[in-house]
């Protein structure tokens, strides 16, 4: 298929494979989850790390598994990345994001805390962000026994796609609720709005892996109609007062992604609010390019991982 943007070969293959009907968002949620889980069985290099998991009660929001990932070394970790996974609020798990989380932990020498929040449509907004915020707000109590040496002043919230959306929500909720103190946020191609007629939505509406119709379906699964457009779901609609004082932010977007316009617009709006922003657009790639095992060795993924881990390491010094 001839596309208007030249992609790396591996990204072309992913686009072609994902275009075979039925599309993942046309399946019942459980079947779609299985499709992504199987796709992420693709062999890939996994950085050596130590992983432990526990179920944590988030009060009225229920029990969720939380994974704690540390680099395999003798030196104690001092910094934390609180990572929220993407995949449309409907799909995704620790397995689908394991290679990404392992690399972040190993290359930044951080403890990565990974909540496996309740997914939609079974759990609607704001369940997932409330679960994540509960873990974040109680992070130091939860980790103190096993990791007493953690630095409370270098906390990073991070996420990809809708996980980036929820990472932004964590920063907004922490501002509104008085903590915890978040130093920085790392956002890979984040969802920041529910507007489907942006330039990137129009240009990449289909045939580029993430379809406009797919994003519309994801939003329908996640947001109750009566919820409206709260800024913890649509942060691009936040005013300057709400965005002022947000953490230092890195935003990495892919060129051929329906979400690119809103990700870039959010970075610009943060700058207008006085926030320290580093923004990168990676050419020749598609949505999910840092998450998908099949794209791990592409120039796009390696560039994004080099840039983001270097940024975290620099800011943690």
Enumerate the language-model features and the residues they cover:
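Active-site glycine-rich loops that stabilize anionic/oxyanionic intermediates
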Residues: 85-90, 256
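Alpha/beta hydrolase fold serine-hydrolase catalytic domain that processes acyl esters and thioesters
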Residues: 152-154, 168-317
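Alpha/beta-hydrolase active-site loop
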Residues: 123-146
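A glycine/proline-hinged amphipathic helix-loop "lid/cap" segment
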Residues: 1-71, 228, 299, 317
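Gly/Ser-rich "nucleophile elbow"/oxyanion-hole loop immediately N-terminal to the catalytic nucleophile
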Residues: 141-157
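Gly/Ala-rich beta-loop-alpha elbow adjacent to hydrolase catalytic centers
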Residues: 159, 163, 167
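Short amphipathic alpha-helix adjacent to the substrate-entry channel of hydrolases
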Residues: 95-114
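Proline/glycine-enriched tight loop/beta-turn segments at coil->beta junctions
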Residues: 62-64, 71-80, 243-246
